[in-house]
Amino acid sequence: MQATIHNEFLTLTVDTHGAEAVSLKNTAGEELLWQADPAVWKRHAPILFPWTGKLPGGTFEAKGKTYKGGQHGFARDVEHTLLKAEGDTIQLELHADEAIKAERFPFDFVLTSTFRLDGKTVHHTLSVRNPGTEELRFGIGYHPAFNIPFDAAHTTTDYEFRFDQPESPVILDAYPNGLLNGKNHYQWKNQQAIPLTDDLFANDSFCMAGLRTKTVGIYEKDTGRHIVCNVEGYPYSLIWSAPAKPVRFVCIEPWQSLPGAEDDPQDWNQRAAAACLAPGEEWSTTLSTTFER
């Protein structure tokens, strides 16, 4: 099922499968989100929960049992309950039912996704509550994909990623399987812009740590049109696109937790996490994205 809201600038559609934003159009009717061509990448803007990246061996252990887990958790692959779709707000909820706890993740949780339109900005808040009787440890992140180019008159090299100040981000290195290898390097030094090319992501994504910038955006160089994500408070920000020539979309991904590492312990309670909630506690994070195009 899908729900749609709109204001004077934007029209947003969210699917209850994965609580995923699947369409965002401006007043000209132009589609701003990637439309999930399965020949390139079959998603639009998935929620990453309760882990980000891959699990070493594709498994984790909890409560004496081994659980299999795919990339970026499972919230993106299951049905969420629509709570509200009116005015400028869409709200959905996912809770750990018996099937989830038996097959995917043996901990109680309630994940609430709230989308709110505010002028040309979409605020997407993810709230996690622990309704159980034991600690809840989880990872979480965002993965929106934006159409590139903005129109037929432009090509890949007409675009660049920009920070709001010069940056020398620490790039966390990964093995070809996507798991972190414990090393890092500097890809760019004291740069405020990263030129977009068709080969930029030939070796997959860039996981950036240590950013001081409050924003990461994709800009059309000759017009100034842009899409900007507020990444303030996020320890990790990734940029990525699927292999395609020319580039069809770009992702700007603020994460509150690290991707999995090759030497991560199998015990879930020893894994790095975005947060560890005691019973009754609640935690939230918001991604605000502004569309000036």
Model-predicted regions and their roles:
Residues 1-8:
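Short, Gly/Pro- and small/polar-rich lid/capping loops
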Residues 11-66:
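Acidic-aromatic substrate-binding/catalytic surfaces of carbohydrate-active enzymes
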Residues 14, 60-68, 126, 275-292:
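Short Pro-Gly-centered flexible turn/kink motifs
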Residues 18, 96-98, 115-119, 130-132, ...:
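Beta-strand elements of well-folded, non-transmembrane domains
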Residues 70-119:
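Extended, loop-rich substrate-binding clefts of extracytoplasmic carbohydrate-active enzymes
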Residues 101-151:
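Acidic, contiguous internal or C-terminal segments within carbohydrate-active enzymes
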Residues 148, 152-232:
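Active-site/ligand-binding surface loops and adjacent short beta/alpha elements
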Residues 226-293:
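Active-site pocket scaffolds in enzymes
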